[in-house]
Amino acid sequence: MPRRRVIGQRKILPDPKFGSELLAKFVNILMVDGKKSTAESIVYSALETLAQRSGKSELEAFEVALENVRPTVEVKSRRVGGSTYQVPVEVRPVRRNALAMRWIVEAARKRGDKSMALRLANELSDAAENKGTAVKKREDVHRMAEANKAFAHYRWKSLRSFSHQAGASSKQPALGYLN
């Protein structure tokens, strides 16, 4: 296979009801067996319930919940001299959203409520209040990165250069040891 050029990321069509690309991605992550209309109805129903509980608009409430679950750092395995180290690295912006959405959907699927729409609404509302399984997952990932910050100097250069190519902001990383 030729390795000459990098294929660009595909543009995703915005959500038909709210016009949000983020929400369209969320629907795609929730979708099972290609049943997009089912996934859309679950998400819209959950957002409606969430908006009634929070008193905010559907999109605003979703954004708050997502913001509370987005990780800023994670650990990646790096093999150095026969031993494997968990090296903390900053998470790229696109991956932050993807991880947060994936964690929310996983947590909602594990809940014991009646319908998936209700499970999703409850998980999103917990995330908006900084509690719940998805937020706990983010805290665990951050705790792992904090515990392994001694290995931050094992980061490889390709990650740093990749984060700048991906359009990451030039501001300081969330934790000081990643400089």
Swiss-Prot record:
The keyword Ribosomal protein applies. The keyword Transit peptide does not apply. GO terms for biological process: translation. It comes from the Bacteria. It holds the Pfam family Ribosomal_S7. One of its GO terms (molecular function) is structural constituent of ribosome. One of its GO terms (cellular component) is small ribosomal subunit. Keywords: Ribonucleoprotein, Ribosomal protein, RNA-binding, rRNA-binding, tRNA-binding. InterPro entries: Ribosomal_uS7 (IPR000235), Ribosomal_uS7_bac/org-type (IPR005717), Ribosomal_uS7_CS (IPR020606), Ribosomal_uS7_dom (IPR023798), Ribosomal_uS7_dom_sf (IPR036823). PANTHER family: RIBOSOMAL PROTEIN S7. One of the primary rRNA binding proteins, it binds directly to 16S rRNA where it nucleates assembly of the head domain of the 30S subunit. Is located at the subunit interface close to the decoding center, probably blocks exit of the E-site tRNA. Belongs to the universal ribosomal protein uS7 family. Part of the 30S ribosomal subunit. Contacts proteins S9 and S11. This is Small ribosomal subunit protein uS7.
